[in-house]
Amino acid sequence: MKQSHFFAHLSRLKLINRWPLMRNVRTENVSEHSLQVAMVAHALAAIKNRKFGGNVNAERIALLAMYHDASEVLTGDLPTPVKYFNAQIAQEYKAIEKIAQQKLVDMVPEELRDIFAPLIDEHAYSDEEKSLVKQADALCAYLKCLEELAAGNNEFLLAKTRLEATLEARRSQEMDYFMEVFVPSFHLSLDEISQDSPL
């Protein structure tokens, strides 16, 4: 049986730090970011279904979100100001991401490839799926800004402002619900979020 390096590569996502050009009170790696995006994307899908008449597969959304940055294990996490410096760079980076996604898919044993390819190749996402994952991705970046600012790190002030504009552009009913119900707690201390539910 032929060996596959697929999961050995994915395990290295934890070695790639996000926000590499900014001082961080606490560094965040791509692996933990992907887990948070998966949880938030699942929540957005569940909220959409339960509250706003949606009909999306929340579990699939969580899986797509879990793999949404998988190609960064081959490309690294390019800082946003570089990635979107101009339209040409953004377009070229998209092409590089596509190649990296295909390279990852090709690592999967052929008999399993049809399972993993639609998770890694974002071109297999429906528009609705892509929208939910992008909303969750932006929300998690925004939450990171809130955490850094709460720790006194003003380095994230402009990033927060930029992400507020991104969230506004991707705004949805499910995002509004999430922002109203879950986000305010990110401004609180551990004692404040624990006082209602002591162990």
From Swiss-Prot:
It catalyses: a 2'-deoxyribonucleoside 5'-phosphate + H2O = a 2'-deoxyribonucleoside + phosphate. Substrate binds at R18, W19, H33, D69, D77, L78, P79, T80, D137. It comes from the Bacteria. The record marks R18 as: Appears to be important in orienting the phosphate for catalysis. A divalent metal cation binds at H33, H68, D69, D137. Residues 30-142 form the HD domain. The keyword Nucleotide-binding applies. GO terms for cellular component: cytoplasm. Its main location: cytoplasm. GO terms for molecular function: 5'-deoxynucleotidase activity; metal ion binding; nucleotide binding. Keywords: Cytoplasm, Hydrolase, Metal-binding, Nucleotide-binding. It is an enzyme of class 3 (hydrolase). Its EC number is 3.1.3.89. The keyword Zinc does not apply. Catalyzes the strictly specific dephosphorylation of 2'-deoxyribonucleoside 5'-monophosphates. Homodimer. This is 5'-deoxynucleotidase YfbR. The gene is yfbR.
